Amino acid sequence: MNQRTGILLVNLGTPKTPRPKDVYRYLNEFLTDGRVIDLPWLKRQLLVRCIIVPFRYKQSSMLYQKLWTAEGSPLLVHGIAVQTKLQMILGESFQVELAMRYQNPSIEEGLERLKLANVKEIVIFPLFPQYASATTGSVHQEVMKHLQQWQNIPTLTFINSYPDHPGLVGAFCERAKQYDLSIYDYFLFSFHGLPERQIRKGDSTGKCLTENCCQVICSDNAFCYKAQCYRTAKAIASKLRIKLEQYTVCFQSRLGKETWIQPYTSDLLKDCLAKNRKKILVFCPAFVCDCLETTCEVSIEYAEEFKHLGGDTLHLVEGLNSHPVWIEAIKTIIQEHLPHPHSQFSR
């Protein structure tokens, strides 16, 4: 039997259930990651375990209860669907596994299943289109933590980012077909935020967050999360023929009092109303699966706030989830990153 290529799809993670104790456990694991809150170990542990989680887990539990479906966590449900559909189109030459950076199924479990399958190479595919140390970087670090214990380490391919890949862009544009773009006054491309400090930390040039430094990606800012977000938004807007003056890139999900990358989505909603833009369509291209940040934060909380302040409508473009166009995009991205042609792709 020919050895197969292993594909490990990795997303952020989800609590086992929306119950407070499970949310508590999830938040502790997530927020004590040194790449997520990059403070010295003791300070991070005290901040997370004694302040952030004890004060947030019950509120987060209530949000997860709104998000949860009869099938379970949407992030996990959609993830399993992506895994299943990708396996079907890739065929027996590949083994596709799903893992979560935090909680289950874990990265260690996914790697062990690939090891048992005796795969000759492994492709690590983080489900984060834009690179950030707190997401993709953390995934790669966790993968190496476990692989370094293996006697025989297979050929590894790490996919770092794909912010303007035609497949990703095409999939979001396919989702946008559900909406009549002509009825909206303005468009927001809302990405998950990061502390400014983390963005600067990855910069070796001293130019980070200076005027227009994120508008074009070059060798100096190739790993800049904010620059990659602008690149994603520009590609989607261009394909949908949304003009530059019709949209803004913004950032959501801020945690704590530290300055995060701006503009903040919540502030832009108020700015839209001040400019009489009352019908808004929001894209969230940092999230390929609908989750707490899209379904609850944008589609419920921001939409309610916008209407309360005098807006007419705020609609969210549905996530890619397990849409067939997205599955094909994943296949293409994998194909482009494999170190050699694969018979499955040459048919």
UniProtKB/Swiss-Prot annotation:
Recorded superkingdom: Bacteria
Keywords tagged on the record: Cytoplasm, Heme biosynthesis, Iron, Lyase, Metal-binding, Porphyrin biosynthesis
GO biological process, one term: heme biosynthetic process
Enzyme class label: lyase
Binding site for Fe cation: 192, 293
Localization annotation: Cytoplasm
InterPro entries attached to this UniProt entry: Ferrochelatase, Ferrochelatase_C, Ferrochelatase_N
Gene Ontology cellular-component annotations: cytoplasm
Reaction(s) this enzyme catalyzes, per UniProt: heme b + 2 H(+) = protoporphyrin IX + Fe(2+)
The EC number(s) this enzyme carries: 4.98.1.1
Pathway given in the UniProt record: Porphyrin-containing compound metabolism; protoheme biosynthesis; protoheme from protoporphyrin-IX: step 1/1
Gene3D superfamilies linked: 3.40.50.1400
GO terms assigned for molecular function: ferrochelatase activity; metal ion binding
Signal sequence, renumbered to the chain: none
Alphabetical list of SUPFAM superfamilies matching this protein: Chelatase
PANTHER family linked to this entry: FERROCHELATASE (PTHR11108), FERROCHELATASE, MITOCHONDRIAL (PTHR11108:SF1)
Protein's job: Catalyzes the ferrous insertion into protoporphyrin IX.
Similarity annotation: Belongs to the ferrochelatase family.
Protein name: Ferrochelatase
Phylogenetic classification of the source organism: Bacteria, Pseudomonadati, Chlamydiota, Chlamydiia, Parachlamydiales
